[in-house]
Regions:
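A general structural signal for well-ordered alpha-helical segments in protein cores
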Residues: 40-41, 117, 142
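Predominantly a Rossmann-like dinucleotide-binding segment in NAD(P)-dependent oxidoreductases
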Residues: 1-52
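An anion-binding loop in the catalytic cleft
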Residues: 98-104, 117-126, 136-137
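C-terminal helix-rich "cap/oligomerization" subdomain common to oxidoreductases
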Residues: 122-166
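C-terminal substrate-binding/catalytic lobe of Rossmann-fold NAD(P)-dependent oxidoreductases
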Residues: 64-115
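Short Pro/Gly-enriched beta-strand edge/turn motifs at strand-loop
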Residues: 46-54, 77-82
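A short beta-turn/loop motif at secondary-structure boundaries
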Residues: 57-61
Length: 166
């Protein structure tokens, strides 16, 4: 079976309100991986299968980075709410940066998320939402990450992590 190499980068800058709100408190929100990363963790499970191993490289109130070994992929991820973590300047530093590389092929999915929550809520209200069983794998992975101690720059870590650590 093919094992894919995946780099996931999601940087969605937030204003000062974020740290002052419940979202900025890891005890209330579950942290960055739960708040902004759970959807991507879920997507990766749907595509590449269940988790086999997790490694947390970095965890702070504004950033989470780590490695996920899934049945069909090795995933290095970098999640942040800090605009300064963007890999390159942008006309609007507050706009999201969503980037996926699979076996060297780049996918920029920065656009197209405008009404995602609205569509999801409409489907839920129409009785076509997701069941707990549909998300259990992602929630289990998130739980494993939240119970992990950050190991720093060891093993197979996301390249943007060097900017934070060095």
């Amino acid at each position: 079976p093919t094992i894919y190499d995946v780099d996931l980068t999601y940087i969605t800058p937030r204003g000062s309100w974020y740290a002052a709100s419940w979202k900025g408190d890891p005890c209330k929100s579950g942290g960055v991986a739960a708040n902004i990363g759970i959807h991507f963790i879920d997507m990766l499970h749907w595509i590449f299968g269940p988790v086999e191993k997790v490694v947390l490289h970095h965890s702070s109130p504004e950033c989470s980075a780590g490695f996920l070994q899934l049945k069909g992929a090795r995933v290095r991820y970098f999640l942040s709410v800090n605009a300064a973590h963007r890999p390159s300047p942008n006309d609007n530093p507050m706009s999201p940066y969503r980037h996926l590389v699979i076996n060297g092929e780049e996918f920029d999915f920065t656009n197209g998320f405008t009404d995602l929550h609205t569509l999801s809520y409409e489907r839920i209200l129409a009785g076509r939402g997701f069941a707990v069983e549909d998300t259990a794998c992602a929630v289990h992975t998130l739980d494993m990450l939240q119970k992990s101690a950050a190991v720093g720059l060891t093993g197979d870590y996301h390249p943007l992590l060097r900017n934070l650590q060095g």
